[in-house]
Amino acid sequence: DALKKNYPLGLLSEKIIKEITPSIFKDIEVYFSAILSKQGMQEGKNYLSLQIAQKLTKDFLKLEQRLINEATANNKQISLVRKEVDLEYYLFVDGLNFKLSGKADRIDFEGDTLRIIDYKTGKVEGNEVAFTEYDELISNNKKAKAFQLLMYAYLYLKMNPQYQKKEVVAGNFAFKNLKSG
C-alpha cells in the first residue's frame, strides 16, 4: 500500500524515486503501528517483520532505480500509466456468459513496450512463469503465476484495444527475489 499511495503516475525518474522514498518508509511504519502497539514494534518478531518490510522495499526501490537508468541508457523512459487496475471481461461461450476478472498492480510503459506487472510478496522462480505449451497452464499447478499474468494481459488488452498492436510484457516483481530479475 505504501508504494501504491506514493508512486506518482507519469514518467518515473531516479529523482522521483529518491523524493518518494522517505514517504514510503514513513507509511510502512504507520501501517505497522496501526496493527501493532508502538512498544510491540521495538522488539521481537514484530520488530523483525518491520525490518524485513523495510529491507524488501529498499531492495525494490534500488531495482526500480536500476531499471530506470537502464531504460534511459537505451533512450527509453518508464511511464507509470495505472495502479491497482481492476480487469474485467465477459466471454460468451455456447450461450453462456463467463466473467473473467483480476487486478493488476501496475501498468506502465518502458519505451513503447506495455508492461503489465503484478507484485508478489514472496518468491517467484523463473520456471513458474515460463511455459512452452499452453496446456501446461491448465495441467500444471506450478504454472498458476504464468496463467495469471497471461490472463491479466488478455483482460487488459480486451479492455484497452488501442494497445493490441503494441509489444506487451507481463511479469512479476517478486520482493523476496528481486535480484534474480
Predicted regions and their residues:
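Active-site-proximal structural scaffolding
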Residues: 17, 21, 25, 46, ...
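Non-catalytic protein-protein interaction segments used by genome-maintenance enzymes to assemble
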Residues: 77, 82-159
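Metal-dependent nuclease catalytic regions and adjoining charged, substrate-binding loops involved
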Residues: 32, 141-144, 151-181
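A non-catalytic, helix-rich entry segment at domain boundaries
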Residues: 2-83, 88, 181
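Acidic/polar residues at beta-strand termini and the immediately following turn/coil
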Residues: 69, 90-93, 118, 173-177
